[in-house]
Regions:
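N-terminal small/polar loop signature for handling phosphorylated ligands or for N-terminal nucleophile
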Residues: 68-146, 282-294, 300-301
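Short beta-alpha junction loops
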Residues: 86-89, 158-159, 342
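Small-residue (G/A/S/T)-rich helix-start motifs and N-terminal tracts that mark the onset
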Residues: 1-82, 92, 177, 188-340, ...
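Internal gly/pro-rich beta-alpha loop/helix module
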Residues: 119-120, 125-217
C-alpha cells in the first residue's frame, strides 16, 4: 500500500515529526535537498561539466529546500544559480538561515540571470498547500520556467498545482519530474496534476508512519505486486467459486452483457447467468456459450439461485428495465453491484423510491456497490459534471455515505470509497480504456471477485486495479489508440498469479 496525502495531512505529519519525534525542521529540509540532489546527480553526474542548474526559489520552506539544494550542488562541483521570487523580508526563518549559509558558496544569485543559459530548471516556489491562483511575479516566474529549454524538476509539487485535487490554479509549472517529500501528494496522481508532475519520486526525508500518531492518511493506492487475490480451492467445483447473476443488455445491447459476463468468468467466477432481453438469446449463447441464459421473466427465480448480483450494463431506461431494477432491489438482499442505466434510473424521478429503499437496505447491512462514471455521478448527486470531476474523491465519499455503500467513481483516475475509512485511488490503466464497453468489463470483474467471496471494498479496489492492468496489457498489444473493450476482457488475469 502507498499512502496519498493532502496538504493538511502532510503539514500535520511534518509537525508531529518535529514536535513529538524530535527531528528538527532544518534536518528535514537538509534531507529533502539531499534527495533532490541525488535525483539530479543520477541523471547529470556523467555530464556535470556541461550541466548548469537554475533554481527558482520562493520565500517559503519550499524555497528553502531549493536554496539548500543549490548549496549541495555547488559543493559537488555543479554550476548553479538561484533566482529568488518574492519579498525576502517575508521569508520564513529557515529560508533566511539557508540564504545566509548560501552566501559562502559559489552560487550566482543576482537578478540578471539569463534563463536560456541553463539546462536544468528547478521549481522551488510553493510546494504543498497552495490554495489560490498563481499571480503577479510568481505567474511570470512559472511562465519563464515553462519557456526554458532543458530538464525541468519540481520540488515536492509543481507550482500552480493544487496538492489535494491536481487542479491547475491559474498557471502551473510543467515538470519532467517531481521529487516529493515524505509521502506522495494526491494532486501528483490525480489529473491534470499527474501530467504536470511527470515522473514522480517519493523521497524518504525522515517523515514516516511513526509521524501519523494514530491519524493515518485518508487515501491510498496499490503498489505493483501488492494486490492479493483469493486462493483457489484445489478441490473446489464451479459452485465453490460462486454463482453470479448479471442483469444486462436490452434489445440491441447484447454486447454489454457479453463483455460483463466474460469479465466475470475471466476473473474467476464459477457460474455466470445472464438475464437479458429475449431478443438477445441467440447472440448471448453464441458470444459467450459458457454463460447460462435467462429472460426477464425468470429474474425472480434467478435471484434465489445467485450468490451475488449485478444490474445495469446496457439495460436502458424503459419500463422493463425499471421493473427489473425494482425486482432486484425489493426481492433480494444479496450483494448487489449497480452500474450504468441502473444508476441513471435511480437518479430519475421514477426511481426515487427505489433509491430510498436501497439507502435503507445499505443502512441495514446489505452489501451495495455503485460504479458511476462522472456523468452518472453528477445525476445521482445533483451536481454538475465539472464539480464532480474537480473533486472526485469528495464526491465519491458523499455517494458512499448517502447509500451506505462502496462507491467506485470512474474517471482517468478511478476512486473507490466506502462509507467509513480510507479511499483508494487507482493508478493502473491508460487513455485507451476510454472506449465503449470498458465500464461493462469492470462491472463483470467486480462481480466475479464478489462471487468468490471477496468483501465489497476489496473486490472494488482489486477489481479496478486488475481492470486497469488488463487495459495496460491491451495497450501493449494494440497501442492506446487501438484498445477495444473486448481486448480488456481478453487480457484479464494474463501474466497474473496470486499477486498482481
Amino acid at each position: 500500500m502507498k499512502y496519498l496525502v493532502t496538504a493538511q495531512e502532510m503539514k500535520q505529519y511534518d509537525k508531529n515529526t518535529i514536535e513529538y519525534l524530535g527531528i528538527p525542521g532544518p534536518v528535514l529540509m537538509e534531507r529533502a535537498a539531499l534527495a533532490a540532489e541525488d535525483f539530479i546527480k543520477e541523471r547529470f553526474d556523467a555530464v556535470k561539466e556541461r550541466t548548469k542548474v537554475l533554481i527558482f526559489a520562493g520565500m517559503g520552506n519550499n524555497g528553502g529546500d531549493g536554496l539548500a539544494l543549490a548549496r549541495l550542488l555547488a559543493a559537488d562541483g555543479y554550476a548553479v544559480a538561484v533566482k529568488c521570487v518574492g519579498d525576502m523580508q517575508r521569508a520564513t526563518k529557515q529560508w533566511k538561515s539557508q540564504w545566509q549559509t548560501l552566501q559562502h558558496f559559489p552560487v550566482k544569485t543576482d537578478s540578471n540571470i539569463a534563463v536560456d543559459e541553463y539546462n536544468v530548471i528547478v521549481d522551488a516556489l510553493f510546494g504543498v498547500g497552495l490554495s489560490r491562483p498563481v499571480e503577479g511575479n510568481y505567474a511570470d516566474a512559472v511562465k519563464e520556467m515553462n519557456k526554458a529549454e532543458g530538464f525541468k524538476l519540481a520540488l515536492d509539487v509543481p507550482s500552480g498545482i493544487c496538492s489535494d485535487t491536481g487542479r491547475v490554479l491559474g498557471c502551473a509549472f510543467l515538470a519532467d519530474a517531481t521529487v516529493t517529500f515524505g509521502f506522495c501528494k494526491r494532486g501528483l496522481v490525480l489529473y491534470p496534476g499527474a501530467e504536470y508532475a511527470g515522473e514522480v519520486r517519493t523521497a524518504n526525508v525522515g517523515i514516516g508512519q511513526e509521524s501519523f500518531l494514530g491519524q493515518e492518511p485518508e487515501m491510498y493506492t496499490y503498489e505493483k505486486g501488492s494486490v492479493q487475490l483469493i486462493k483457489r480451492n484445489a478441490a473446489g467445483n464451479k459452485g465453490t467459486f460462486g454463482k453470479a447473476l448479471l442483469v444486462a443488455g436490452s434489445t440491441g445491447m447484447a454486447g454489454a452483457a457479453i463483455l460483463a459476463a466474460k469479465a466475470a468468468y475471466r476473473t474467476g467466477a464459477g457460474m455466470v447467468k445472464v438475464i437479458t432481453a429475449e431478443e438477445n438469446r441467440q447472440i448471448i449463447q453464441q458470444g459467450i456459450p459458457e454463460a447460462l441464459y435467462g429472460s426477464c421473466r425468470q429474474l425472480t427465480e434467478s435471484l434465489d439461485w445467485a450468490d451475488v448480483i449485478a444490474i445495469g450494463p446496457g439495460i436502458g431506461r424503459e419500463e422493463q428495465a425499471l421493473q427489473c431494477l425494482k425486482t432486484v432491489v425489493e426481492r433480494s438482499r444479496k450483494p448487489l453491484v449497480l452500474d450504468a442505466d441502473a444508476l441513471n434510473l435511480l437518479a430519475e424521478e421514477s426511481g426515487r423510491m427505489l433509491a430510498e429503499e436501497l439507502r435503507a437496505q445499505g443502512a441495514e447491512g446489505r452489501v451495495i456497490l455503485l460504479t458511476p462514471h462522472v456523468g452518472e455521478m453528477s445525476r445521482l448527486l445533483k451536481r454538475t459534471t465539472a464539480e464532480c470531476k474537480d473533486d472526485l474523491p469528495t464526491c465519491a465519499k458523499i455517494l458512499a455515505e448517502r447509500f451506505h455503500a462502496v462507491a467506485v467513481a470512474k474517471d482517468a483516475r478511478t476512486v473507490v470509497c466506502k462509507e467509513q475509512g480510507a479511499c483508494y485511488l487507482n493508478t493502473t490503466g491508460n487513455s485507451g480504456m476510454a472506449t465503449a464497453g470498458s465500464g461493462d468489463v469492470l462491472t463483470g470483474v467486480i462481480l466475479g471477485l464478489l462471487a468468490q467471496g471477496m468483501d465489497a471494498p476489496e473486490a472494488a479496489t482489486c477489481g479496478v486495479y486488475l481492470h486497469g492492468m488488463a487495459g495496460d496489457l491491451a495497450a501493449g498489444l494494440h497501442t492506446e489508440y487501438g484498445v477495444m473493450a473486448g481486448d480488456i476482457a481478453e487480457c484479464l488475469m494474463k501474466n497474473q498469479n496470486k499477486k498482481a
